[in-house]
From Swiss-Prot:
GO terms for molecular function: hydrolase activity, acting on ester bonds; succinylglutamate desuccinylase activity; zinc ion binding. Transforms N(2)-succinylglutamate into succinate and glutamate. PANTHER family: ASPARTOACYLASE (PTHR15162), SUCCINYLGLUTAMATE DESUCCINYLASE (PTHR15162:SF7). Gene3D superfamilies: Zn peptidases (3.40.630.10). It comes from Shewanella sp. (strain MR-7). Pathway: Amino-acid degradation; L-arginine degradation via AST pathway; L-glutamate and succinate from L-arginine: step 5/5. This is Succinylglutamate desuccinylase. InterPro entries: AspA/AstE_fam, AstE_AspA_cat, Aste_AspA_hybrid_dom, SuccinylGlu_desuccinylase.
């Protein structure tokens, strides 16, 4: 495995050729500046000899068909392995769901991004590949963050693409973080990366980014970088800004961020999440409606069990509508403009 990686510098190819395991862990040096550790398939760490003050996680492929972030991360990994760029911050790359990537599908059995914060082991337990992998990914995050001295800034960007078009092509979900202000620096880093829209979540979830935020105090985000396309069919020029900013972060180059200003970004607050309670749940709008479509108060969004679900606020925008989820799961997130969020 080691020689294959040294020869190809293609960690994604190695991962997809061995989607369940690489066998034993292995490590090697890049010159005298970086130690590389491979902990598992899809799990690679870059440890600088003289690390600066940040611990950075870039995860992708939690959903197997969201290919642009996978290609973006593999490009960064390849540049690091080729020593075209040199890591100055401790960096962990996670390719989340290799089996689903090989399958060309979002999932194998279950949505992995609902299985963190221990949800993987709740009934029915570790019964499918996503549950087993989510538990392992949690352990790798724990090992990485605890593998350095306390007091370092912890960052986790969980990279995705959405199943539908969007009024705002690139957007981020800021996990619920009671008692902690939102980071102005992080919001402006996202804006510089081309991610000009942020959703402030209103409650705990079982997503990967919430896990890192809640368990480790990380500045963590679920970042949607555009629309789903098959592997190799992404227009990677649309991700130049994101790739550049991630490279600058990892290599400790100046970020040159603008000061925070609410008029430079689109800020939304999650006002509610609508879950499915009956098999007959259906939306009233077209199946191809774009994310962030806004509806007025009183508009019937959906029907189920003989009841109508209406817009409650003056206007509510929607993201991630999906009526074909299991009972008990989220069908849509409803948003309102965020007024005076605690951003510092």
């Amino acid at each position: 495995m080691l020689q294959a990686l040294l020869d190809s510098k293609d960690f994604l190819a190695l991962t997809l050729a061995n989607p369940e395991t690489l066998g034993d862990e292995f490590s090697f040096a890049l010159g005298e500046h970086t130690r590389v550790e491979v902990w598992d398939t899809g799990v690679i760490v870059f440890e600088p000899a003289q690390a600066q003050g940040k611990d950075v996680i870039l995860s992708c492929g939690v959903h197997g068909n969201e290919t642009a972030p996978i290609e973006l991360c593999n490009t960064l990994i390849k540049q690091l392995l080729q020593q075209k760029i040199i890591a100055k911050q401790r960096t962990l790359f996670l390719i989340g769901n290799p089996l689903a990537i090989n399958n060309g599908t979002r999932i194998i059995d279950e949505n992995m991004n609902r299985l963190f914060s221990g949800e993987h082991s709740n009934p029915p337990g570790l019964v499918n590949p996503e549950r087993v992998r989510a538990k392992k990914l949690e352990a790798y995050v724990d090992r990485f963050f605890k593998g350095a001295a306390a007091g370092r800034q912890r960052i986790h960007y969980d990279l995705h693409t959405a199943m539908r078009a969007s009024k705002h092509e690139k957007f981020a979900i800021y996990p619920y973080r009671p008692g902690r202000a939102y980071s102005a620096e992080q919001i402006m880093f996202l804006a510089a990366s081309g991610v000009d829209t942020v959703l402030f979540h209103h409650e705990p979830t079982t997503t990967f980014s919430y896990f890192s935020s809640e368990q480790y105090g990380a500045d963590a985000f679920t970042i949607e970088l555009g629309k789903v396309y098959p592997m190799g069919q992404n227009d990677m020029t649309r991700f130049i800004a994101a790739q550049e900013m991630f490279m600058r972060l990892i290599t400790d180059k100046p970020l040159a961020l603008e000061p925070f200003s609410a008029d430079k970004v689109n800020l939304y607050q999650v006002c509610r999440v609508i879950n499915k309670h009956f098999d007959d749940f259906e939306f009233t709008f077209a199946t191809d409606v774009e994310n962030f479509r806004s509806f007025p108060k009183g508009f019937v969004l959906a029907r189920e069990g003989g009841q109508e679900i209406k817009v409650e606020q003056e206007f509510e925008a929607i993201v991630f509508p999906n009526a074909k989820v299991p009972i008990g799961n989220r069908t849509v997130i409803c948003l309102i403009p965020s007024v005076a969020p605690d951003v510092r």
